[in-house]
Design a protein with these regions (language model features):
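Active-site beta->alpha loop and helix N-cap motifs at the rims of alpha/beta catalytic domains
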Residues: 2-148
């Protein structure tokens, strides 16, 4: 778990993932979206979140999107990767993979499928945070996840 202070501020858009008509990833179109956001002056990119189709993607596809985001950001702004998995163990594994490929941080979502009690949700976030040295952004979307992380 990272102990260093992170001061993310400004606009960090949740980037949509682009697909071809056969539902395969369109990495060129996704890259173009990201490059335009960078050109428009965003403060960072958040990829593989809800609008990034996280739960529809394989781990390999998520890592490809992260690589595209890193290229689009060009080291000028941080890239934050969404971690939304069905179990805490899967989330820990994805956090480690995101760290391995060089993201600047992760946006951790509550474990999927079942709503949890506040102490269970907190335990999930703590467990994922201890699996990596990356800073984490906590994702709170009560209507979708049935958990309020405030």
């Amino acid at each position: 778990m990272s102990n260093k202070a992170i001061h993310w501020s400004g606009v960090f858009p949740a980037v949509s993932t682009q697909f071809r008509s056969d539902y395969s990833l369109d990495l060129d179109a996704t890259h173009a979206v990201m490059k335009n956001l960078v050109k428009d002056g965003v403060s960072g990119l958040v990829v593989c979140g809800s609008v990034g189709e996280n739960t529809s993607l394989s781990t390999d596809e998520k890592l490809q999107i992260i690589e595209v985001a890193k290229d689009a950001a060009g080291g000028k702004i941080p890239v934050i990767a969404g971690v939304a998995e069905f179990t805490t163990a899967f989330a820990q594994k994805m956090a480690k993979e995101a760290e391995r490929v060089g993201v600047d941080g992760i946006m951790v979502m509550p474990a999927l499928v079942y709503s949890s009690k506040p102490h269970e949700t907190a335990a999930h976030f703590r467990s994922v945070a201890t699996a990596t040295d990356l800073p984490i952004m906590v994702y709170n979307n009560p209507p979708i996840y049935k958990n309020d992380v405030t």
